[in-house]
Every structure is written in C-alpha cells, then in structure tokens.
Curated annotation (Swiss-Prot):
Record-linked SUPFAM superfamilies: EGF/Laminin, Growth factor receptor domain
Domain DSL residue range list: 154-198
One GO cellular component term: perinuclear region of cytoplasm
Gene name in the database record: dlc
Cleaved signal peptide residues: 1-20
Name of the protein: Delta-like protein C
Membrane topology: Single-pass type I membrane protein
Length: 664
C-alpha cells in the first residue's frame, strides 16, 4: 500500500514540475485628467483595464491578450489612489519580457463595457522587462488629457519559485518526503533524511551499508546473517559454541576445539588451565588431562599443599616449622644442621670438609664457609642440583656446576620442560580433519572419505563395510549404506527376510457381473453358430441324396437292345470314343415338364441323334483339355409324358482321368 501511495505522490510531483503559477499585479497610484474627459458629469466614474501580450516590436492593442487581462473596480475619478488594484494570474513559465497595455475607460453604466471606443480616456502600450520580484516598480504615463502614475510587479504563487515560477516546492514531513524549501525552491532535507525527495533515512553512523538498513533516522537494522550494533558481525551457525565466522552461518573452531559445533575440547589444559600452584598440565585425550605437581603439593589439580613436618624431619629434639615448599628445624643446644642431626663442635676439631673454612661463633659453635660446589653444615655434601628433579616430563638434568640445565624430551619445551609443544598449531590435518594434540605428535580424526595421518588420502567408505548377499554399497554423509536385494535386510544385508504372504485382493462386484454376462453372451453365440452349421449340413446332405437317388434310378434301368429306340437313347448317356462313363457323382438329373401332347417317335429319335452328335462334337474338342474345367450342357428334350426317361444335365467339375464302372 505504501508503495502505491509513493507512486501516486511521484506522479503528483511530476505534474507540478510541469506546471507554473504566478500573478502580475498593478496598482494605480493616481490618475488626473482634464474636465472635458467626463463630459460635465458631476460624478465621473472610470475603470482601468490591463492587457498582457507576448513581446511585439509593434504593439497592437487589439485582442487577444495572449498572457491574460484584468480590470479594476469602477472608481470615482477624483478619488483614485492605491485602491485601484488589478491582478492578472498566469499558469505558464513567466517569459520575462511582455507587452503591457493599460487602458482608462469612462464607465457610463455599472457595466464595465469596452465595446465603445469613444469611452476610452487613455491608453498606454509599452514593452517591459519584468523579473520575478517582491518589489514594486513605479512608472508614470503622461497623455494628452491625463496623467497616470502606477506601480507593478510579478510574483509567484505559494510553493512556486524560480525566475519563471516553474519550480514547485511545498514543505512536508510525511511518508512522501521530509523537507523544507528555500527561497529558490530547492528542497532542504530535514535532519536525518536524504535523497531527491528526502525519503531515504540516514542510518546510524557506521552502520554497514551492505549488511544493514534503516527505516527511520538513526536506526541500524541487520539483514539475515549479520548482527551487532553496526551489523558488521556475521552470525555464527546455530549451536556453535567455541567457534568464529567470516561469513554468515559459519562455525570455524578456535584453537583446542573441534567438532561440527566446536563443542569438543581437544586441548583441555589450554582452555581451562586446571592445574594449580604452577603445576605442569598434560593433555591425555579428549577432555582429559594430568597435572604434574611441584614439591609440596598434591591432588588431581595439585590443589592440596603438603605439610613437610608430617614426616618429622628434625632430629635430636628439634622442632619443625612448616613453610611454603620447605621447613626449618629449631635445634636444641649442642645441635645444628638442617635436621639438627649434627652435634656441636669447635673449629679446633676441623669439622669443615672439602676445603671449607671454619668460623667460630660466640655461642661456642662454628660455621663452615663452603667452596663452590659443596654444601652442608660441614661442607660435606657436594651440591647436586639435579637431585630435586627439576626437569619435568622426563627431561634430563645436566649439572653444570653453578647451575643445572634440562634437556627436554621431544615434544616438550621450557626451562624445566614443563610445556607440551602444541603439534596442532600448524593445522596439519587436511580436508576438514580434526587435530588432537599428543606428546611429540598429533592424531587426525578424518572426515568421511579421507584417511591417512594427515587425512590427505581419499578412501572409499564402502571398503570398510562390505555388503553381503549381493547388496550394493553407497557412500552417505553419515557413512556407508547398503541397499539390500529382495529378501534380505540389515546394515550389511546379513539377515534373511521372511516372505510376506500376499493376500489376493477381492475382485470388485462389477467385474464379476461383467464377466458373467460376457460368458453367457459368448455361450449363446456359440450355440447359435452350431445350430446354423447343422442346418446347412442337413440341407446339403438332403440335396446330395436326392441327386444320387435320381442317378441310381436311371442307371439301374433294364438293359435294352442297341437297335431299339430305347437302346439308342441309353447310349446317349455314354461318352463316345472312349472307355469312360458318366458316373452318378458327375451327373445331376433334373426333371422337366414333358409336353402333354404326344410326338411321334421319329421326332423323338431325331432329337436323340442330335443330342448324340452334340456330345461327340463336344467330347472331341475337349480331348486336348483333360485337366481343365468344362461344362457340357445337354439341352432339355421333350419326352413323352408317359416316357420312362428324363433329361440329364452335367454339373461343371474338374475332370480327372478315372475309370467309372456302373452296373446296369
């Protein structure tokens, strides 16, 4: 919503930027004329008209007034003063040079009419350069019958500024701007704001321009991933305990810490300093340590001070006085020494050894001044500066006479070998490995996919956990993962999975109904087909039986003499010129109607002869085409009604060479 309002505001401002507004003002200071002007009227009424036109070399008083026009009120001629005020507003850029026309008119009526030029008293037409100013310019016009004194100026309307009244500026302090305006129309931003329209707040000094922003002056709001008063501190990864970041949501572990969230203590001695009383601390693992106490102290952290007098070191009745890391013995009369173990002697006894110098004391005792390298009440002890084991962590003590020097084991340093050298300081572990400091060495805990002392060697995580039973190994960020084949399970596919019984889903009722209807329909179709086939076979069988019976009745007639007419008629059924006969299979007999009138036998015989001739002719032509199909048609004959023979038709069929025997 705010964006829409801001857009509307900019459109409104743009419309004002293309608009100008001002007013031309004129005041008549005095007007005098001859008495003949008012034509003897006792109360002469006049008014003034101002016409502004564009700059013209020859000023034409005729309209139009291109820049505007204005009239004064009707005034009495003898009471003209500064009350005659005329204004001509304009809404364009002020050009600076105009043609000014001032006319004085006689008002015959209350109407300010300028149509009758006889009522015009005077006219001033001049060109003026008028600059925008609050100051009035004065001028005098001397005519033939009048004198006009006037002043004029051009000023801009409120919120318009500049030499042309074209600069719009209205002070405001709201969502659309926070500014005031100077005399020239320039926007002066209020404190805490900037921008062309003073809509951008000035953030807190030092606030990061890249990582911070503000919605009000003096604020500094951080973007995601940054924090701090000036938004110049990156936000660590959530849960990061002992780490830093250079970019948002990083967790770079400090020295001595490791792990994803830098919560694993790898250098307990450095981070916590648990050993007290100047004891030497040694890291022994993740979160563990060992304190090597100085003499006079004990306990896990060397926090317990040892009382050296508990062992009763003073002899011969001497009293023990406990001190820090030491004790003193107060010896009875006649004894001296560290532990009052030496009885009193004099220098005459030569008590000092190893070249010591004996010195008498007033109490009847003596003291020995020992040469360098010896000590003791009688200089009997050779100074062994290594006897106190000053070298820690297995360092070798070297007595050089005046002082002792420690030769440290590899991995330790310091005057007493008390400091364990941090072998992880050089960050030897590569590929994001975690370094654990040891004694004269270090151990790298490598991330997934790397191995070796310094985690430099890429390794296959699947080689450490092979998958069984044909499983496929994949490398996951958490470690190797096995994808088991069907029937196996487990982290390495080592377990056989019991088969799950499969329950056949119940068939839908609609499917059962559809299947039943389809089966019934198929059964009906098959039955109908069987009935039709049986009917066709019966019809065909009946036709064949009828033909066979007719042929048998013909062939089984009694044998006739060849010379008789009937014998010759029978011979017509034989194929001439060969041993073939027409069989019952190749014949089809059809009964035809016989003419009711009897014909003579000569006619009958003639027809039979014609029939035989036609057969002989046909048979002769077909001898060369034994394997081709032929049709032999015997035209129907008119037999006597009482005759015993009927006409015979030969059914077309492929003729093969066969021998037919028919008994007659």
């Amino acid at each position: 919503m705010a964006r829409v309002l801001l857009t509307c505001f900019f459109i409104l401002i743009s419309s004002h930027l293309g608009k100008s507004s001002g007013v031309f003002e004129l005041k008549v200071l005095s007007f005098t004329s001859t008495s003949s002007v008012c034509k003897g009227s006792s109360d002469c009424q006049i008014f003034f008209r101002v016409c502004l036109k564009h700059s013209q070399a020859l000023i034409l008083p005729e309209p139009p007034c291109t820049y505007g026009t204005g009239m004064s009120e009707i005034l009495s001629a003898d009471s003209i003063s500064s009350s005659a005020y005329i204004s001509v507003p304009f809404n364009f850029k002020w050009p600076g040079i105009v043609s000014l026309i001032i006319e004085t008119w006689n008002a015959e009526t209350s109407d300010q009419s300028t149509e009758n030029n006889n009522n015009m008293i005077s006219r001033l037409a001049t060109k003026r350069r008028l600059a925008i100013s609050e100051d009035w310019s004065q001028d005098v016009h001397l005519g033939r019958q009048s004198q006009l004194r006037f002043s004029y100026r051009v000023v801009c309307d409120e919120f318009y500024h500049g030499e042309e009244c074209s600069d719009f500026c209205r002070p405001r302090n709201d969502t659309f701007g926070h500014f005031n305006c100077d005399a020239a129309g320039n926007r002066i931003c209020l404190p805490g704001w900037k921008g062309d329209y003073c809509t951008e707040p000035i953030c807190l000094s030092g606030c990061s321009e890249e990582n911070g922003y503000c919605e009000a002056p003096g604020e500094c709001k951080c973007r995601i991933g940054w924090e701090g008063p000036l938004c110049d501190e990156c936000t660590r990864h959530p849960g990061c305990l002992h780490g830093t970041c250079n970019q948002p949501f990083q967790c770079t572990c400090k020295e001595g810490w490791g792990g994803l969230f830098c919560n694993e203590d790898l250098n307990f001695c450095t981070n916590h300093k648990p050993c007290r009383n100047d004891a030497t601390c040694t890291n022994t693992g993740q979160g563990s340590y060992t304190c090597i106490c100085k003499p006079g102290f004990s306990g896990k952290n060397c926090e317990i001070e040892t009382n050296e007098c508990d062992s009763n070191p003073c002899k011969n009745g001497g009293s023990c006085n406990d001190q820090e890391n030491d004790y003193t013995c107060t010896c009875p009369q006649g004894f001296y020494g560290k532990n009052c173990e030496v009885s009193a002697m004099t220098c005459a006894d030569g008590p000092c050894f190893n070249g010591g110098t004996c010195m008498e004391k007033g109490s009847g005792s003596y003291s020995c001044r020992c040469p360098p390298g010896y000590m003791g009440s009688n200089c009997e002890k050779k100074i062994d500066r290594c006897s106190s084991d000053p070298c820690a962590n297995g360092g070798q003590c070297l007595d050089l006479g005046n002082k002792a020097t420690c030769r440290c084991r590899p991995g330790f340093t310091g005057s007493r070998c008390e400091t364990n050298i941090d072998d992880c300081s050089s960050n030897p572990c590569q590929n994001a490995g975690t370094c654990v400091d040891g004694i004269n060495g270090y151990t790298c805990t490598c991330t997934l996919g790397f191995s070796g002392k310094d985690c430099r060697v890429r390794s296959d995580a699947c080689s450490f956990m092979p998958c069984q039973n044909g499983g496929t190994c994949y490398t996951h960020f958490s470690g190797p993962v096995c994808q088991c084949p069907a029937g196996f399970m487990g982290t390495q596919c080592e377990y056989k999975q019991k088969p799950t019984p499969v329950n056949s889903p119940a068939l839908p009722a609609a499917l059962i109904v559809s299947f039943t209807l389809g089966l019934i329909t198929l059964t009906l179709v098959i039955c109908a087909a069987i009935v039709v086939l049986r009917q066709m076979r019966q019809n065909h069988k009946a036709s064949s039986t009828t033909v066979r019976n007719n042929l048998d009745s013909v062939n089984n007639r009694i044998s006739l003499s060849p010379t008789s007419p009937l014998g010759r008629e029978k011979e017509a059924f034989l194929i001439p010129g060969g041993p073939f006969k027409v069989s019952n299979k190749d014949m089809a007999l059809r009964s035809t109607s016989v003419d009711t009138h009897s014909s003579d036998k000569s006619n009958y015989k003639q027809k039979m002869v014609d029939y035989n001739l036609s057969i002989d002719e046909k048979h002769t032509n077909n001898k060369l085409e034994k394997n081709s199909e032929s049709t032999l048609l015997v035209p129907p004959l008119n037999y006597p009604k009482e005759g015993v023979y009927h006409p015979v038709y030969i059914i077309p069929e492929h003729i093969e060479q066969r021998v037919f025997a028919t008994e007659v």
